[in-house]
Amino acid sequence: DEARARARRERAAKATSSSDERATRAAIEACRLRAISHLCMDFERVAGPHLGKRWCSAFEEWLASASEDEPLVPAGDGGGDALAKKLRAKKLRAKKDASDEAVDAVVRVMMLKATECARVMRNEFRGPATSVSKEERADGVVSLRVGKTEVRLNGDHFEKLKTLYANASSKEFVENDFLFDAFAMVCRYDAAAGGQFRFSGGSQASLHGQVFDVLRDCFKVECELFASPLNCRWPMYYSKYGDVDKPFGSLGDFRACKPSGGAFEANPPFDEDVVARMAEHLFECLDAASSALTFVVVTPHWPNRPCWEKMRRSKFCSRAEVISVREHGYYEGAQHRKKSRYRLATSDTSVLFLQNESAVESNPVTDEKISLLREAFRAKRDAKK
């Protein structure tokens, strides 16, 4: 009896500890979302005039350069280098002053703002959240609130998260635990999309469901390397933010994927540095594979850019297709909270098939399969720019 009582106390203590961790994570992510929202306002004011209409994309890419120790807060040296690179490239394309002085002035201000963002996050944190509330609205939107921070998502995405959460754990489903974890995860992705000042979500845009169906039926693909709990097509996926994504089944960062065989889809953020790192990892996997291995890589059509050319010219590239900007579309990056899920493409897209010799034989890329893939890529009628 004493042993059973002790075991019950230990289980209760562990459950309490786990609940505290969830409540703490939710509070931290709420602070992060508010701080990033203010940082986004500063970025538009300071860097926006130098980056033009697509400054939102540059902001997302800058946030993504942050270290894993403090996600989305690019206060370290890497953040300054990443922003300087973006500014210099934009100014050169626009034939404007790309001198070190012109770029450094913007970078200096924004790095001070990023440091302030990190400080505000630390100062606002007051310990674990005491509660999380859910409201189901008449328009089908579900809102989750912790303190003064609210996030929203469409009802179908909320139900999808429930299913992923239940499937990812062998434990009994606990509604309050789920709500804390869902709130924290949605906060992180809302912050990554620019915060609540200006939602963008370009770096999280995903393929239409019909494209995934063709990849599965024709090329045996059943796992994504760059997904999220909000946009994943299948239960098996890798994602950037393992700390908040794991409760929903994420297998971790794409670099954790080291398969001996199989078929995978890779639609990385459209950032040259990320694509270059991904390419090196995929080459290593293909070299080491002991059986048929295929990666279907979707990126912008980037001829003359080293990261793309390296994949296109690789010994593993069995086929490269280019889909015209007028002939396809995507799901919105912030589809979980937008009325229309569809968006038009903004550039030509390439689909590269990277395969080892065994995969070329057992999983061939044929004209018939490519025709089905192109049809699946077509933009939807209600797609927006």
For every predicted segment, state its role:
Residues D1-A266, F270-K385:
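Class I S-adenosyl-L-methionine
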